[in-house]
């Protein structure tokens, strides 16, 4: 694969109009671009870093900017001459080893552009659901590999390793016992917070999981990271053996939305310890990946991250008005403590941060501005032993959150905060960069004005903001777009702010008890009828607003997604987040 990566680097060098010598130097921490007697040299410790260097040269001197997948920007006025001699871009060790995305949707026609963009921005990792990896073609697997992108086949997957369609009838004892009865697995048909787990203390179940893992990796020899993650939600087994791992007096925590359930860290980590040892005995080349999430956020007593183990700590519903280590925040310092607990038990294993730099799926393209905070957090992660960062994303909403993704990539490689932000604004907006900065400052101020803390779900934003703020943003976006009517990104900002105005109006009408189903239908029709854009994901609105429709019909108060336990936390957020 290294030969193919070198060949791709040479092809991309020519494609972007650059001339340079490519040389491998094992002692470098990353690529370095130099000039020697008028000749450009890209040196790097490996072919993937050489490829990164080719793209860095195209951006630095070739007039290119790689902001979004499939849409290279080229401005000949930004081409520059290089000095006769000296280092142009010095080698710099990336702050984090693993940098990438969590893909929660099938691979599709956008995937080649995504892999291309990731390489252009120095990202090297994708975590995806096993069911989506199963649909990834060999050609796309190679396209990822040649660009240095590792794909983890995993995510929530108890029901993949032990599917109900295979085991419900023959091994009902493999599934959780709830209320004295074994559940019948729905096989993930209800994918939202499935809350169907396994009887994880069953030794035959553990052996079967390992057998299935080994078989899977034999059928997919390219897979080197395989996951064992609970199904989303709760529903842990209550049989006699499993119940030994619960302390009925020890529930979860408010910050991680788990005060209403027992902690599952001990029972989950006992399973992981056993499966990792069995897997290591047969396939020591494999890494076992797993989640820290909701009611199993921190390592249980005595649990260690051994070599070949990798945890991804999900910062679910973190506050986006503060950095993760800000002691003044109500939520985030608890996650910071969890991070430190995980890095303190590393014994050859690795720690990743699972982020939501698009809020969460049902934040519905509402604003999250995490620019300067991104650089500060990546430095904090690096300083405290974190190995990787990944975020959920969608290409379809790139014009809303793409700047977060762009800054995450640069920050995780150790780029300078001020230089990076200035470069992105100048490349995206040219002479209008200062006006664009004012627009994004206004968006950021909208978030800060919501209160001391802000958790990314619609109610938290819309009930604590004013319509005039959204109308002002819309006017600012229109002014920016009027200066470059040919720029689809600026057009998307107009659409984005119009959408926010409409959503705010819908929310206010509901609060005033004036909203009807016809109004909701009109809003959804507007969402679906927009021309091609990278702002809105219509299917997310269809899913989210089923709850609102049900509540309009029943008279129940609409809070979020009609999950009683979740609505309860949101009502408490109303009171405690400031």
Sequence positions of predicted segments:
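Feature activates predominantly on carbohydrate-active enzymes
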Residues: 1-8, 12-15, 36-269, 273, ...
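Short, flexible beta-strand-to-coil junctions
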Residues: 25-27, 45-47, 61, 499, ...
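Short, surface-exposed beta-strand/loop micro-motifs that present aromatic residues
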Residues: 29-36
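Short loop/turn motifs enriched for small/polar and acidic residues
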Residues: 25, 229-231, 291-293
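Substrate-binding groove of N-acetylhexosamine-processing glycoside hydrolases
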Residues: 2, 136, 142, 189-196, ...
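Residues that cap or initiate secondary-structure elements
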Residues: 26-28, 48, 107, 234, ...
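Auxiliary, metal-adjacent structural segments of Zn-dependent hydrolase domains
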Residues: 17-27
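Residues at or immediately flanking beta-strands
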Residues: 21, 225-227, 287-289
């Amino acid at each position: 694969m290294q030969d193919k990566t070198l060949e791709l680097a040479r092809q991309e060098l020519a494609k972007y109009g650059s001339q340079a010598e490519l040389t491998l130097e094992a002692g470098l921490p990353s690529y370095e671009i130099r000039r020697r007697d008028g000749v450009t040299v890209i040196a790097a410790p490996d072919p993937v870093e050489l490829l990164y260097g080719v793209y860095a040269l195209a951006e630095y001197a070739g007039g290119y900017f790689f902001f979004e997948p499939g849409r290279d920007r080229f401005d000949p006025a930004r081409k520059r001459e290089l000095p006769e001699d000296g280092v142009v871009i010095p080698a710099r060790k990336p702050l984090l080893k693993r940098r990438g995305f969590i893909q929660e949707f099938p691979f599709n026609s956008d995937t080649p552009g995504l892999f291309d963009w990731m390489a252009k921005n120095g990202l090297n990792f994708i975590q995806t659901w096993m069911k989506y990896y199963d649909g990834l073609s060999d050609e796309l697997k190679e396209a990822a590999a040649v660009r240095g992108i590792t794909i983890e086949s995993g995510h929530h997957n108890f029901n993949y390793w032990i599917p109900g369609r295979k085991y419900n009838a023959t091994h009902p004892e493999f599934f959780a016992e709830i209320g004295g009865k074994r559940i019948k697995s729905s096989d993930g048909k209800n994918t939202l917070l499935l809350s169907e787990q396994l009887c994880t203390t069953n030794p035959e179940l553990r052996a079967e999981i390992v057998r299935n893992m080994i078989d899977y990796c034999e059928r997919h020899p390219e897979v080197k990271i395989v996951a064992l993650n609970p199904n989303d939600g709760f529903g842990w087994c209550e049989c006699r053996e499993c119940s030994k791992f619960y302390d009925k007096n020890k529930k979860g925590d408010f910050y991680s939305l788990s005060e209403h359930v027992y902690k599952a860290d001990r029972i989950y980590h006992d399973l992981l310890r056993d499966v990792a040892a069995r897997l290591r005995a047969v396939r020591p080349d494999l890494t076992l990946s797993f989640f820290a999430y909701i009611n199993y956020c921190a390592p249980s007593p005595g649990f260690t991250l051994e070599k070949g183990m990798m945890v991804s700590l999900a910062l679910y519903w973190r506050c986006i008005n503060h950095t993760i280590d800000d002691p003044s925040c109500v939520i985030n310092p608890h996650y910071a403590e969890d991070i430190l607990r995980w890095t303190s038990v590393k014994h050859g294993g690795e720690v990743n941060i699972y982020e939501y730099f698009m809020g969460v799926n049902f934040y519905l393209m509402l604003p999250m501005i995490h620019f300067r905070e991104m650089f500060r957090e990546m430095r904090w992660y690096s300083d405290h032993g974190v190995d990787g960062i990944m975020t959920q994303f969608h290409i379809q909403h790139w014009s809303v959150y793409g700047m977060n993704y762009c800054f995450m990539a640069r920050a995780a490689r150790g780029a300078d905060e001020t230089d990076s932000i200035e470069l992105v604004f100048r490349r995206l907006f040219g002479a209008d960069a200062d006006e664009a900065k004012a627009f994004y400052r206004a968006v950021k101020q909208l978030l800060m004005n919501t209160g001391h803390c802000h958790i990314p779900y619609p109610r938290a934003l819309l009930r604590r903001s004013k319509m005039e703020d959204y109308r002002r943003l819309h006017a600012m976006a229109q002014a920016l777009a009027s200066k470059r009517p040919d720029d689809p990104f600026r057009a998307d900002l107009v659409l984005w702010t119009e959408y926010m105005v409409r959503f705010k109006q819908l929310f206010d009408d509901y609060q005033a008890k004036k909203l009807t189903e016809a109004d909701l239908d009109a809003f959804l029709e507007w969402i679906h009828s927009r021309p091609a854009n990278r702002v809105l994901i219509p299917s997310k609105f269809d899913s989210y607003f089923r709850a609102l429709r049900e509540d309009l019909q029943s008279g129940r108060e609409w809070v979020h997604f009609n999950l009683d336990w979740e609505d309860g936390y949101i009502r408490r957020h109303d009171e405690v987040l400031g």
